[in-house]
Curated annotation (Swiss-Prot):
Protein name as catalogued: Furaquinocin biosynthesis prenyltransferase
GO terms classed as biological process: antibiotic biosynthetic process; isoprenoid biosynthetic process
Source organism (scientific name): Streptomyces sp. (strain KO-3988)
GO molecular function, one term: prenyltransferase activity
UniProt record similarity statement: Belongs to the aromatic prenyltransferase family.
Protein's gene: fur7
Length: 307
């Protein structure tokens, strides 16, 4: 079936799939932006998980994201720099990946590109079951100070030794920290308390129900403030529209008409911004591989905590 190992993964085929999928959302892929990224990583596409992602908030309006995995022996940021996919920077965001590599074992990387914005993110997946700790990560000089500044918060909710994935956004200069969170973190009172603790508006009733089904969460931080920007929750589902209609008509059209990964599970993420806006991200798969850390990194049964 489309979306599994039987799809074509050469650059031309992947680009064609991106172009068609983005078109379902009335987004036109910029070939001059997308093609150089795909060709830079052409050698790894054969074994990669490839996913498409769309968000409902205004900031992501008109863009469409593509994510694919990269084996641990390939440094995705180094490739991006060598191919001029992104400019070298003296900002700490440019040093974070190499600092993590020197400190931590890495299983897999992920790359995100926008069909308008190009190469923008790298994801670092730690080996399955080998969670990193904030005690180690906060010692990195390139790490945002907001991570260390919120250690008490993360410790309070049992997250300080449960870091599973780090996401580095080079364009927005933000960082995501994914946690293999204890099941209590998805309960209504805890969700409410976590939002209140960091000064975010209370989630809606619909989002509380969404969180009850979550498999994991991540927080977004930056280098400019000591605040946690937002907490996002993820749900794994074969039919995202059964959860809510807030994905919007365009995303609903995408879900119903995308020809790839029809029978594979989707990921839906939800978050509340500081302004009180609730928005959602849908991740659908062009090529699904269940053995990949992209799918297994933070999908371990949420009620099972590592000893």
């Amino acid at each position: 079936m489309p979306g599994t190992d039987d799809v074509a993964v050469d650059v031309a085929s992947v680009y064609s799939a991106i172009e068609k999928s983005a078109g379902l959302l009335d987004v036109t892929a910029a070939r001059e932006v997308v093609w150089p990224v795909l060709t830079a990583f052409e050698d790894v596409l054969e074994q990669a998980v490839i996913a498409f992602r769309v968000a409902t908030n205004a900031r992501h309006e008109g863009d469409f994201d593509v994510r694919f995995t990269v084996p641990e022996e390939v440094d995705p940021y180094a490739v991006a720099l060598s191919r001029s996919l992104i400019a070298k920077t003296d900002h700490p965001v440019g040093s974070l990946l190499s600092d993590i590599q020197q400190l931590c074992s890495v299983d897999t990387y992920g790359v995100d590109l926008g069909v308008k914005s190009g190469f923008k993110k790298v994801w670092v997946y730690f080996p399955a079951g080998e969670h990193e700790t904030l005690a180690r990560l906060t010692g990195l000089t390139s790490m945002p100070g907001s991570l260390a500044g919120n250690v008490d918060f993360f410790t309070r909710y049992g997250l300080a030794d449960k870091v599973d994935v780090i996401g580095i956004d080079y364009r927005s200069r933000t960082m995501n920290v994914y946690f293999a969170a204890p099941s209590e973190c998805f309960e209504r009172e805890t969700v409410l308390a976590m939002h209140r603790d960091i000064g975010l508006p209370s989630p809606s009733e619909q989002m509380f129900k969404f969180c009850e089904n979550s498999f994991g969460l991540y927080t977004t931080l930056n280098w400019d403030t000591m605040e946690i920007e937002r907490i996002s929750y993820g749900v794994k589902t074969e039919n995202p529209m059964t959860f809510f209609a807030r994905l919007g008509t365009k995303v609903e059209h995408f879900v119903k008409n995308v020809p790839y990964g029809v029978d594979t599970q989707k990921m839906v993420y939800a978050a509340v911004t500081s302004s009180g806006e609730e928005y959602y991200k849908l991740q659908s798969y062009y090529r699904w591989r269940s053995v990949s850390r992209l799918n297994a990194a933070y999908i371990a049964a949420r009620d099972k905590e590592s000893t």
